[in-house]
């Protein structure tokens, strides 16, 4: 019985990681002075806007808190789920943003991406 649980554990670990990283997507990276923006084809516009917003908010946030990250912060933009959310991982210097397309009909005129990038980067700093 222990062997059975061990095999289940190993298979679960192996397959959960490949699902999470979405190896079926072709990831691209935009490098700016302070950030590495990772995105896939469906989030190209979001990736480009993220790069502009992130650089715009970098100086005000880092000067306010008098702290700058030691290395470039990674921002990952994905559209693999039907949610809009963000998360900051301080120890990894990484921000994950689950974003619906910018031209989504129900989005309205609210600049959600600007707010979430500012909010999550503040957690990093």
Which residue stretches match the model-derived regions?
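Juxtacatalytic substrate-recognition/specificity segment
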Residues: 17-125
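Sec-dependent N-terminal signal peptides
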Residues: 3-14
